[in-house]
Structures are given as C-alpha cells and as structure tokens.
Amino acid sequence: MSDSDSDASIEPPTQGFADSTLTATEPPPNPLMESLKQEIDLFDKLYGKQRGFSETHGKEISRAERKREGYISTTLTYGEIKFETFAELMNILKGRHGAMKEDGGVFVDIGCGIGKPLFGAALLHKFDKIVGIEILEDLYKVCVETMQHWTRHVKPVLGEERTQDMQFSFLNNDFLIADWSDADIVFMNSTCFNRSLMIDLSAKGKALAPGTIVVTTTKRMVGPAFDLVEELQMEESWGDATVYIQKRVERS
C-alpha cells in the first residue's frame, strides 16, 4: 500500500463551533495496550532501535542466508507478527478459549525467526517453558543473542519471582523432526507454508495432547484431529492475514 497526498482542504469551523477540536481521526485508547505499557517498552528493548534493529531486521537476515546458501523453497520466506497484534491474540486465547488461566504451560513457535513471539509470550504470561524451532541458523543465532538481552535488561525489571522458573529452548532444527508434542499452545506463521507442509505438520501435530491450542496464519491444520474454534483477521508485518485458532481433539 502506498501513501498518497491529498489536495482536499478542511473548511473552517462554522460559527458556534470555533472552539471545537477535530478528533475524528484520532484512534480511541486501547485498554489492553494501555495495560501493557511496560511490556511494550521491554519488547522494544529486545527488538527496537536500542539494538539497532529495524522493522525488517529478521527479513533481511533471512533473505541474506537463503541467498548465501542457495535455499529456494518459498516455505522459508520470512514473516512475523507485531507485538501489539500478538498481545491481542494471546488475550483472545485467554478470554475466549480457556488458555493461560493459571501460570505455567508450554509455548512453542514453529519457525520462530528471530524470536519475537517467543519473548512476546514470555512477557505476556508466566510459562514454564518456551520453545522456538528455526531451521535457518542466522535467525536462530539472533534468538540466542536476544536471550542475553532478556537476562540483562528484562529479567531485572520483571523480577525473580516472575522469571526464575521460566525455561527457554531454541532449536536450530527442522520442525518436522524436532519434538514439540508437550506444547499447550503452538504458534506458527504459516502464510508461506505450502499444502504439503501443512499436511505433514498436521500429521506431526497428532502427537499433541487433546485440548492443545494451535494458532496458524493463512493456512490451517488439516484433518479431523483439529477443530477450528475461531477465525479472525489480524495485522502481520506484511499486512492483514487470516488467523486460525484450532484445538487438538481426541479423534484422529
């Protein structure tokens, strides 16, 4: 989408409204975002200008490695979700689908890139374990480096009680090989995954316990092992995408 200039002018206010202000274009306050000011600030410490990161940092790293190694599969195309959007998604999972009612649980990101959903999840809920699986080594290395920034800049703010029992695991591996069967919530930015890969992921996902929530973008898990419980539109790094929320059910 490109920006365009408008030549339209605003008429001066009519008599009797000289003191009125134009507020129609101002977005209303978002109560959720207002309550997450600290988390937004901490996320920016991990992925913002303080580390020299641009909004396209992960995409640039991914593109450079794929070009260097000669990887041509479109399933490796990079995409990520914004923190504010991810926070809204996690709030929906908690409010509508029974997730994260108590501390604990395991969060897994399939194809985690530079780790934004991983550390976003850690800021939003006290998980027992957070697992990121990423096959591109350079992206995986950023996750490991970000863990150092988490320890140095985020843990002291959140406090020992909030973070001491939280374990992080970063796997530089193929997510069809790695074990993620203990997940309570699985997230995957699957917009660029092809149907064959989604079929394989769905087969792999049968190892998940019934009740496990699986969140995907654009493409959803296939087969009777997963029930669709909600479909919505959310903002991704490249624009709006369909988000599917599914639950693992006992039938296979």
Label every PLM stretch briefly.
Residues 129-134:
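Conserved SAM-binding motif I beta-strand of class I
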Residues 181-196:
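A short SAM/SAH-binding and catalytic strip from SAM-dependent methyltransferases
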Residues 117, 138-139:
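Conserved short alpha-helix immediately C-terminal to the canonical SAM/SAH-binding motif I
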Residues 11-103, 140-180:
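S-adenosyl-L-methionine
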Residues 193-251:
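C-terminal substrate-binding/active-site "lid" region of AdoMet-derived donor-dependent transferases
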Residues 103-113:
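Conserved class I S-adenosyl-L-methionine
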Residues 116-127:
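Conserved SAM-binding loop of SAM-dependent methyltransferases across substrates and taxa
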